[in-house]
Amino acid sequence: MKRLYRIFMMLSLVGLVSCDLDLYPETSYNEGNVEVNASTEAQYDTREEMLGLRNKIYGDWTKGIQEYGYQDFLIYTECRADNAYCGTNTAEIMQIEANKQDGENVNVTRDWGYYLTQMSNANQIICYVDRILANDPAMTQEEADRWSAEARCWKAWALFQMSRLWGSVPVVNTIPPAITSENIASVYYEYFPPQQPLDVVYSQLVDDLTFAIEHAPDVTDDKFVFTKGFAKGLLARIYAEEAIRDWNKVAQLCASVENDYGYELCENYGDMWAYTEADAVRNTKESIFEVQWTNKSEGNWVYMMFHRNAYDNMANYSWAKWVTPSRDLIEAYKAEGDTERMNTSIIIDQCAWQNYYPGDEYAFNHKVPTNVSSIIVMRLGEIKLLHAEALACLGDLAGATKLVNEIRARAKINPIKQPASQDEMIDAILHERRLELAFEGHRFFDLVRHGFDRAKKIHDEMPQKDEYWQDRLPLTQETILMPVPQSALDDNPTLVQNPGY
């Protein structure tokens, strides 16, 4: 009945609907090969229009990454584990910390739409570039391949984030044709596609990133460009996931990122988030991909969600901040004597609230210290620890230990001895990733990657260890994933709610 109703509603639009991509829902995607449906009218005709779309990739990142891809993602990754309290009494983030989220959650709803929109925008390049190459002699094959590769990196990042949050999701691959009375039934599932199982999702990720590894730009000094290095690093992350796991491929990809593109660890951990009176640091030799702002009169706004702007000290500092560092994380740094990473990741300051600490000694996330500080999406330190993880899972504990100790040496703390067992090595790597990558969006999924029991133990024990955590519903296999937003279910009757919600 719902399908018939939808078809009726679509028929009512025939004659009114052009193939403007903004007219169909953000859940409206189809599986299959990336292509423009033969009956889809051309939206773009020239190289200049395609260049504008390519540039829009990066413009969109400076906007959407702040709220959806960083701020919200830290709630899912840091506050669902042991790194951070949610920070305020905002209902939607309190629900996620307490494992009480539902399909009406504001963050869950907006983030679902954000990731689908990014894939849709990427498809405007992927689906049209060959047509423009054939019709506009100003475009070269190299440009077409490069811009498609950059769009595929964008799309793969969004799809991977989405799959970790929701599991089976719609796979974005085609631009639906205009609706006519003749095709209304056949295009239904292009406008209202079902979720795809993880093997389909991951197959798409591998396809897109394999293309990007061949055709994306080479690495340059500009780290706000999708490159071969980023594509390999993202594919390494993907092959570490249970649904497609291949530790040999993870190790090979990480080794290539480490050795083939000129990346190096910064001498000091804090160099990546440093700033002077004139400007913030960007494009360090360790950075693989970062989102950049260069104009202090505009810049990012997301700094205000976590602390102050070092260039305008009292601006937006009258209300409690999100993602407050936990006592457990601070103690983990102190137990290692790890002042280098602690003092970069966490700053102690005075404030007018006392939600988790006394107001004269309050802890804040300090990974976005100014409104022109970059958000680092991928860097070499993470890839080295992912490489260590792969080696440990392949039984090379000596190789894994060596990589961990490279990271510890940069942090100016003592090396670890080679653990006696694989499980102990994994624990050591997860601990190191926690200290190295705090507030970069990894912790919860690091734990999940190595088994439900690890994630559940840490998730469930926090309220018993520290009264400042909210009481949490026990983590279950089902609540590792977020609920599908109710609004998405209402808009697309082919979607089904995730189990447990």
Predicted regions and their residues:
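Bacterial N-terminal signal peptides
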Residues: 8-16
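Long, intrinsically disordered, low-complexity segments
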Residues: 18-21, 44, 85-87, 115-118, ...
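Membrane-proximal, proline-rich intrinsically disordered regions
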Residues: 19-75, 254, 472-501
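Short, surface-exposed recognition loops and adjoining beta-strand edges that mediate ligand/DNA contacts
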Residues: 30-31, 68-91, 169-181, 217-305, ...
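Conserved, well-structured interaction surfaces
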Residues: 42, 46-55, 59-64, 88-166, ...
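Flexible, polar/acidic helix-loop-strand segments at domain edges
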Residues: 95, 175, 325-380
